[in-house]
């Protein structure tokens, strides 16, 4: 009966449902995202003409969504809610670093260190295990800032270790590097998810979570392009150190961004 009443109510308001859709906003958002991804995928040979197109599509998206009563992307809310926008930036940056290591380190283990794909997978296994353990611990932590700060510091420490690592490194060093990047993966995931939950408006939680996932995907795509840029046809010690330099600088920026974010002082909801 309740479902029937809901169906009858929906049937009586088809225009309301149609008005809540935003096909142009969806198209502009998709166009902006796809164009940005195409640029990021070719960082070795940048397609510079795509950048003006990204700017035009992004500007059109912002202009259109500001005038919608039910926008697909609430850009007005994002402009006003700097804490949430900062969380997206922090999440995307953290996963850019994590994906650089997750895929770039494994490739280096095979190409430069000479490990088989099976052995390289075993070396990377502690990274996944550490991430799983820290996800459980992070979910039970009341604060938000402390886990995210620890995650950023660990990413910086892991990057520093990679800078000192070469193809003659011992197995203990290789495993330590994997663990150092696995721990912050779990902490960053649960910490940023808690931040989104605390900072997003009550009625827009689903859209806010979707934008967080989008930030993570952009980080993954950028990481894949950077790996190709640093390694070329084959991973080397020099390529690993170049990657570690970039991830180290990003990690330091992440520490500053996290420590300086006053919005993270509030606990979880």
List the model feature ranges, each with a label.
Residues 1-89, 97:
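Hydrophobic transmembrane-helix bundles of small-molecule transporters
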Residues 10-15, 260-269:
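Intrinsic disorder in cytosolic terminal tails and internal cytosolic loops
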Residues 70-266:
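12-transmembrane solute porter fold
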């Amino acid at each position: 009966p309740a479902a029937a009443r809901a169906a009858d109510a929906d049937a009586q308001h088809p225009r309301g449902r149609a008005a809540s859709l935003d096909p142009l906003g969806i198209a502009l958002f998709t166009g902006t995202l796809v164009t940005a991804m195409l640029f990021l995928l070719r960082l070795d040979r940048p397609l510079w003409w795509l950048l003006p197109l990204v700017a035009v599509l992004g500007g059109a998206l912002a202009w259109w969504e500001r005038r919608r009563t039910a926008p697909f992307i609430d850009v007005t809310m994002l402009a006003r809610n700097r804490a949430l926008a900062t969380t997206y930036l922090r999440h995307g940056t953290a996963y850019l670093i994590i994906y650089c290591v997750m895929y770039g380190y494994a490739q280096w283990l095979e190409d430069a260190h000479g490990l088989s794909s099976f052995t390289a997978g075993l070396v990377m296994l502690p990274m996944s295990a550490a991430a799983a353990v820290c996800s459980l611990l992070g979910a039970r932590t009341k604060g938000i800032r402390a886990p995210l700060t620890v995650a950023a510091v660990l990413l910086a420490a892991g990057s520093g270790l990679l800078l000192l690592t070469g193809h003659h490194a011992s197995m203990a060093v290789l495993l330590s590097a994997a663990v150092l990047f696995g721990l912050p993966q779990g902490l960053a995931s649960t910490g940023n998810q808690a931040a989104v939950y605390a900072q997003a408006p009550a009625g827009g939680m689903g859209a806010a979570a979707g934008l967080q996932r989008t930030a993570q995907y952009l980080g993954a795509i950028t990481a894949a392009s950077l790996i190709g840029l640093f390694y070329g046809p084959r991973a080397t010690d020099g390529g690993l150190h170049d990657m570690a330099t970039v991830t180290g600088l990003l990690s330091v920026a992440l520490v500053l961004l996290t420590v300086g974010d006053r919005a993270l002082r509030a606990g979880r909801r």
